[in-house]
Structure formats: structure tokens, C-alpha cells
Amino acid sequence: MTNIVANYKTFLVKIVVLAIGKTDESWIQEGIDKYSKRLKHYIYFEFQIIPDLKNRKNLSESQQKEQEGRLILKQVQNTDLLILLDEKGKEFHSKGFSDFLQQKMNAGIKRLVFVIGGPYGFSAEVYAQATSKIALSKMTFSHQMIRPFFAEQIYRAFSILNNEPYHHQ
């Protein structure tokens, strides 16, 4: 596979991370902001928050997933590549994840949309629309904690693709 080690802005690729619910803690938001700012050097990157459901406490788990699913799918365009962060997804080491991103960008995808679901995961409709599922770990993390972890992993992937010293083998 040919490596495209360049500023991906040239190819108009955009990475969007969708997350359900506002970020609860300022230190979590600081982590997201830190890596979002660093990523702008490489690619168009956006972290979008889908507002919490109103009356969430009065909804069943399946109702929450269905309603959140509708909100997620409203944000997704027909040409997007929808990738879910899911505990049953494929696990990558950092180099493998950078290769995964490279492959998607080389395929001419204009928007890679990664979704961090709510506390109960995703609706069947969201699973049906997704092209891939990835897992960051076999361990379970809150949907809040995953936000800065995943932003850092995307940054790490781009540092690997650009042969920069951030990642150590």
C-alpha cells in the first residue's frame, strides 16, 4: 500500500467524532481540546456533541438507544463512512489504527465519522448504517473518558503516518 504522508487537508478529508451528551468535567474537555488543536495541523477535525435526551431518566434503555440513534443518524451524510466505538469492535494497536485511517483516506472518503455512543450503546439502526466497529480496549470505559482517549489515539495515528517522534515502538 502506498503511504500518503502529507497534510490530509490537501485531500479534503475530514474526521468528525460524534458523542452523546455534554462533556461532564472540565479536565476531560481540556484533553479533548488539546488533541483537537494538535490534529488541526494534519486534518480537518471536529468533535461534535449531540445534546443529552430530555427526560432521559424516564426512558427505558431501548428507548434511549432508539432516540439517540435518530439524533446520531441526523448528523451522518450519505457519503460518510460511519465507524462506531463499540466494545465488540475490532481492536487495533496504534500502528494498525494509523494504517486503518490511511486506508480509509486513500479510498477517497471525504468524511470519517466516529461515534461514541451513550451509556447503553447504539440502536439497531445505527449498527445497520455503520461500516465498521472499533474497540479501544477490552476494558470498559465511560463514554466520557473515551473522548480524550480517542482524540489522543487519532493524534497518535497521524504522528505515526507522518513519521513524527510522538509514538514510540
Predicted regions and their residues:
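N-terminal amphipathic/basic-hydrophobic helices that include classical n-h-c signal peptides
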Residues: 1-12
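A structural signal for isolated positions on well-ordered beta-strands in alpha/beta enzyme cores
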Residues: 14-18, 46-48, 113
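Structured adenosyl-cofactor binding patch, chiefly the S-adenosyl-L-methionine
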Residues: 124-168
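S-adenosyl-L-methionine/SAH cofactor-binding core of RNA-modifying enzymes
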Residues: 43-45, 49-110
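A mid-sequence interfacial segment
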Residues: 98-137
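Short glycine-rich anion-binding loops that position phosphate/pyrophosphate groups of nucleotides
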Residues: 23, 87-90, 118-121
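Conserved RecA-like P-loop NTPase ATPase core
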Residues: 17, 83, 117, 150
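N-terminal beta1-alpha1 ligand-phosphate binding loop
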Residues: 12-39
